[in-house]
């Protein structure tokens, strides 16, 4: 009787360890899938910035004519003034 109780407890402990390891592996694969789906590549550093690209107002590198670095939004935006 005592031996069967010990085997049952050992079996339940083993089952919980296996379930926990399986859950960790599943969570790892879920995190991998989510990181692949929501992976956003950083724009390459270029000397010339396009419309709505992030910029630095103190070092305006917006390319096209009429594009200026907005001090408010810090993005290359059209400038219709002088």
Curated annotation (Swiss-Prot):
GO biological process, one term: defense response to bacterium
Subcellular location, record wording: Secreted
Disulfide bond positions: 48-63, 55-69, 62-76
Note: Negative results: this toxin does not inhibit potassium channels Kv1.1/KCNA1, Kv1.4/KCNA4 and Kv11.3/KCNH7 (IC(50)=53->85 uM).
Source species: Grammostola rosea
UniProt keyword terms in alphabetical order: Amidation, Antibiotic, Antimicrobial, Disulfide bond, Ion channel impairing toxin, Knottin, Lipid-binding, Neurotoxin, Potassium channel impairing toxin, Secreted, Signal, Toxin, Voltage-gated potassium channel impairing toxin, Voltage-gated sodium channel impairing toxin
Major location (coarse): secreted
Full protein name: M-theraphotoxin-Gr1a
SUPFAM superfamilies referenced in this protein's UniProt entry, alphabetically: omega toxin-like (SSF57059)
Comment block on domains: The presence of a 'disulfide through disulfide knot' structurally defines this protein as a knottin.
Cellular component, GO annotation: extracellular region
Free-text function comment from the UniProt entry: This cationic hydrophobic peptide acts on a lot of different channels and has an antimicrobial activity. It blocks mechanosensitive ion channels (also named stretch-activated channels or SACs), without having effect on whole-cell voltage-sensitive currents. It also affects acetylcholine receptors (nAChRs) through interactions with membrane lipids by prolonging the closing time without affecting channel conductance or opening activity. It shows high affinity for lipid bilayers.
Modified sites of kind Phenylalanine amide: 80
GO molecular function ontology, one term from the record: ion channel inhibitor activity
Database matches in Pfam families: Toxin_12
């Amino acid at each position: 009787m005592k031996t069967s109780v010990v085997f049952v407890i050992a079996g339940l402990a083993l089952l919980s360890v296996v379930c926990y390891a399986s859950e960790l592996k599943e969570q790892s694969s879920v995190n991998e899938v989510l990181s692949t789906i929501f992976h956003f590549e950083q724009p390459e550093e270029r000397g010339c910035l396009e419309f709505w690209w992030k910029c630095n107002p103190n070092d305006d590198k917006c390319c096209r004519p009429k594009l200026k670095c907005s001090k408010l939004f810090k993005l290359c935006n059209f400038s219709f003034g002088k």
